[in-house]
Regions:
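Short, well-formed alpha-helical segments that are part of the catalytic scaffolds
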Residues: 13-27
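Donor nucleotide-sugar binding loop of glycosyltransferases
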Residues: 14-17, 41, 94
């Protein structure tokens, strides 16, 4: 039986990138469905989507990456998809790795599979500051729930139908990737990584700067610790 796979593409002000990303999927990976979630873009992203007759959902205001991705998960769950794939709308993630992302889910080995640029350290490795932050989250997650994830902030990931349904009810609003790993593990879902090669952003500017990076680390750290404490109180015992 061929699995029903949906690619979720959250997009905020990606007028310079989104057409290339979607054209690549349509022309080379047509076996997968896709949905773009236009997260209240203030540039001409929506015009690009309409002009090209792309499949998209239009949010009336910016909900942040978490809200955009969760909207995609709700769409996937409502339409009966077996696997939901998240990729960024800036061209960094290569859909050629999707087959490798979904295979562990099909084999029953995982509920979430994350594409890591650090397992084989090929391709674009991001800035030294971001690498430091990613390494920090690797150790934090290991300390809190025992899982070792080398690329916890990677937005290139696949989720099973069961995990997708869970995310429709519980998903962090802002900078959700590390927290989604923690909540998945604590709730009994299996999480693993595979090596992928990522590219530099294809155009435009990232919304993450040095100041936002510091804010991101503080906010996500607090969110993860609070989530872990709440789970501990709920179960009355730690998971490690």
């Amino acid at each position: 039986m061929i699995p029903k796979v949906l690619i979720i593409i959250p997009a905020y002000n990606e007028e310079k990138n989104i057409e290339k990303v979607v054209r690549n999927i349509e022309e080379n990976f047509s076996q997968y469905d896709y949905i773009i979630v236009n997260d209240g873009s203030t540039d001409s992203t929506k015009d690009v989507l309409e002009r090209n007759h792309f499949h998209y959902l239009d949010l009336p205001q910016n909900l942040g990456i978490g809200g955009g991705v969760q909207t995609g998960y709700k769409y996937a769950d409502a339409n009966g998809y077996d696997i939901a794939i998240q990729i960024d709308g800036d061209g960094q993630h290569d859909p050629a790795f999707i087959a490798q992302l979904i295979q562990p889910i099909l084999d029953g080995q995982a509920d979430m599979v994350i594409g890591s640029r650090f397992l084989e350290k090929e391709g674009f490795q991001t800035s030294s500051m971001r690498r430091l932050g990613i390494r920090y989250f690797k150790h934090l997650l290991h300390a809190l729930c025992g899982v070792t994830i080398t690329d916890a902030t990677s937005g290139f990931r696949a989720s099973s139908a069961a995990l997708t349904r869970y995310f429709t009810k519980d998903y962090a609003e802002d900078y959700p990737e590390p927290e989604a790993i923690l909540s998945s593990v604590l709730n009994g879902f299996q999480v693993m990584e595979i090596p992928v090669v990522m590219r530099e952003r294809q155009g435009g500017e990232s919304s993450i700067n040095a100041l936002k990076s510091v804010y991101y680390m503080i906010k996500v750290t607090l969110a993860i610790i609070i989530s872990r404490i709440r789970f501990w109180r709920k179960r009355e015992k730690p998971c490690f």
